Each structure stands twice: as C-alpha cells, then as structure tokens.
Amino acid sequence: KTALAATALSLVRDGLVGLDDPIRDQLFTLRQLLRHEAGLADYGELADYHAAVANHEAAWSADEMMQRLGGARLRYSPGTGWRYSNVGYFLIGRLIERVTDLALEEAVSRRALTPLGLSRVRFAKTRADLQNSHLGNTSNYDPAWVYHGLLIGPISQAALFLDRLLAGHLLPPGLLQEMQTAKTLGGPIPGRPWITPGYGLGVMQGSIEGGFTLCGHTGCGPGSVIAVYRICDGNASACCAGFETGASEGAIEALVVQKLMQTLQLGAEDA
C-alpha cells in the first residue's frame, strides 16, 4: 500500500491529480482512499473469498469480486468514518493506470521504485512468480487474489524503500508531511506495540512506548507477515523490515521495534 501511495502522491506532486478533488464519477477523494475514509468495504470480509483462497482456486476477476462484495456501494459517507479497505487501494491502482496510461507495475516502477533506487522488486502476477520466494505455503497461491497488486523482493529492499521515501527522496516536504498526518484509531492494541495507532496516506503511524513514533506498514500475505517501520530520535533515524511465516502481526512488529530501539541505542552510544 505504501508503494501505491507513493506512486499516487507523485501524481499529486506533478499536478496530475488533486489530493482533495473527487475521483472521477465518485464521491470520494484520493486522500480519503489513501487513508481508508472513502466509505468502501473490503473483500477480506467475504467468507467465499477466504474459502476460495484456501482451496487454491484461481482468482476471481476484479469485476466478479466487486459484484460479490457490492463494492460500488458506500458503507458510509466519505470522510465521516474509517474502514480498512483493500478495494480502496485497488481503485487507487486503477487511477494510477488511467492517469499515467501505463500498466500498474510499470507506473509504480517508473514513479516510485526506480527513483528510490530499487531494482530487485517486482509484481507477482502468476503462481510461477512465487516459486522462488520465501512466503510460507505459497505453492498454489494465485497472487491475483491481491487485487491492488503483490510486490515481492528481498526484505532489504522494503527497508530501503521506506527509509528513502520518508527521508524525502521522492516527495516534497509538504506532501511528505501530508502522507504522515495520521488519523488516530483508538488506544493500545493488545499484543501489539502501538499506544496510539493511526493511519496516514498509505502508512501506519503511531506512538509506542518511550514516546517514539513509528511510521511504515504491516501486512499479511500468503502464508507470511511483514512489518517495515522507520523511527526517528532527533537527527537520528533507523529503519527495519522484518518477515516471518505465519500471520502474527504483533510478533513481527515487536521484533522490528526491538531492532529499531537497539539501533537507536547503539547510535547514541557511538555518539
């Protein structure tokens, strides 16, 4: 999601899309899509979706997914609520394709990955694309089930991407600040490091113990979970990406936070 957000915000940077202009033929804006405030549902709510994935079926077409979900029907008025929605990011992908006149993978590569120096990341589009990956039990998984796209590559590339993005190597300061302006989503989450979790424009952001703020993203994929976060302390910063098989978001987040705090502490001692 962060890669899609960075790509979409590069369109805003270049004056090709307005962050707060309604998307064509819709009531919501790009900002609302990016921050999950557009009123859309999520295909993860469909029991049939999870059953089909578990049975190693071929992915439905995007049109069939939207029909099964009733995805065009808003669940609340845009801007008045919050609901995590992969459908929103699927629509962001379509917006990127329409504005750039490029396939999504080419647009993301040209506008986000290549400018940030990433050369070992690609979209998985077929089952064969996952054969040499370390994503847990993926031998029969169809990556087309991820309707907004499934990026794969070395875990180090995820850390490099986030670190360079948040260091300002792609977006101007004002737009980067917009990206990191988060909607607070309640209080502490049991089993996870967040004290005040929040969501910005394609990034999870919030405070953790010690008064530090994390910015990045956690995500569950086929048979695995990844967390990549950046933390700052004055002029010092650290970025870490972690991966493990299974589906425990809290466990991988705890590991990443531990590594980040150790890195900051070592930096302070060296100073």
Regions found by a protein language model. Name each.
Residues 9-28, 99-127, 172-177:
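Short, well-structured active-site flanking segments
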Residues 38-45, 115-125, 184-191:
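Secretory-pathway/luminal and periplasmic proteins that interact with or process carbohydrate-rich
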Residues 73-78, 89, 138-147:
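Flexible glycine/proline-enriched surface loops and loop-helix/loop-strand junctions
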